């Protein structure tokens, strides 16, 4: 468990060269993987990807390291040639190219990734339509929960996946859905849950359903996810003895890790991604 922290710029774990590189990139970039730079150890990892039908009419983006690639990772099950897996959940714009790029970036760390589709193939850049799509799911959450649970079942059935090492990760609307999956995973418990500025549940009794570590990434200027709500969330996790890492970044708002957002903050995005990878390595391998 960790106390609520507010990482400052001078605590960011960026190398000098990375800082210079980040500062030279303009706001016109639409792909966060251009900005999140790994230390190079897995830059040569080759990936395989395909579109898969994992739930009713829903098709997701499956990506994983090719068998010929050498991934530097602490995978506990590498002796039987299986990898940990992550269900990646899109924001309110749908399963777009940015989410697929993030899935690729995560796969290079040694994970099998299934980026799900909760919008029946629809991708939008229109905020009004995005709000309609997400509100439809909030009004009738059962379908989305069934979709996400099927994603876990699908991953666990793959021969290259360790079914005991599956996590979920989502941003914004996807962060909320990552938490909802955690609260509805009785049949197949997860190994970790990652939430980037998603709507929270703060009732201790409800959160008691979670029996694995939780990582939360938030901004203190986020009007839709206020800091007070984050504090209550952390307190409820602690009350249940749920291992957690909660980070609230100073001076940034909602969707700060999305390069198409007006709130985009590249340095905080880099630091949050490093924390995400460290968290997943610790609890997935």
Segments and roles (model prediction):
Residues 1-10:
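N-terminal export signals
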Residues 210, 216-218, 222:
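Short beta-strand/loop motif that positions the catalytic acidic residue
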Residues 149-209:
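Primarily recognizes the serine-hydrolase "nucleophile elbow" in alpha/beta-hydrolase
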Residues 238-285:
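C-terminal catalytic histidine-bearing segment of alpha/beta-hydrolase fold enzymes
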Residues 11-12, 20-38, 43, 51-156, ...:
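Serine-hydrolase catalytic machinery in alpha/beta-hydrolase-like enzymes
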Residues 148-152, 234, 277:
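Generic structural signal for well-ordered alpha-helices
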Residues 102, 226-236:
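Short alpha-helix in the alpha/beta-hydrolase fold that links the catalytic acid
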Residues 118-122, 199, 252:
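Short beta-to-alpha linker loops that shape the active-site pocket of alpha/beta-hydrolase fold enzymes
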């Amino acid at each position: 468990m960790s106390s609520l922290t507010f990482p400052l710029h001078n605590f960011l774990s960026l190398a000098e060269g990375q800082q210079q590189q980040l500062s030279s990139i303009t706001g016109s970039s639409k792909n966060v993987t251009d900005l999140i730079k790994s230390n190079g150890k897995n830059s040569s990892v080759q990936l395989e990807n395909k579109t898969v039908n994992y739930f009713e009419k829903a098709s997701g983006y499956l990506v994983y390291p090719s068998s010929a690639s050498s991934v530097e990772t602490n995978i506990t099950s590498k002796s039987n040639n299986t990898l940990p897996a992550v269900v990646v959940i899109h924001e309110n714009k749908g399963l777009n190219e940015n989410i697929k790029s993030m899935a690729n970036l995560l796969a290079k760390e040694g994970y099998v990734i299934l980026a799900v589709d909760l919008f029946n193939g629809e991708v939008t850049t229109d905020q009004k339509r995005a709000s309609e799509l997400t509100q439809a799911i909030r009004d009738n959450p059962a379908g989305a929960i069934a979709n996400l649970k099927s994603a876990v079942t699908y991953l666990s059935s793959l021969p290259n996946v360790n079914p005991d090492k599956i996590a979920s990760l989502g941003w914004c609307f996807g962060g909320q859905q990552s938490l909802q999956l955690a609260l509805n995973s009785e049949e197949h418990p997860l190994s970790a849950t990652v939430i980037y500025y998603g709507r929270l549940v703060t009732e201790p009794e409800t959160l008691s359903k979670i029996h694995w570590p939780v990582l939360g990434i938030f901004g203190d200027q986020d009007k839709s996810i206020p800091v007070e709500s984050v504090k209550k969330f952390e307190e409820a996790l602690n009350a249940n003895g749920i291992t957690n890492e909660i980070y609230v970044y100073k001076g940034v708002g909602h969707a700060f890790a999305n390069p198409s957002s007006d709130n985009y903050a590249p340095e905080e995005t880099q630091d949050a991604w490093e924390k995400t990878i460290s968290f997943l390595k610790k609890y997935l391998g």
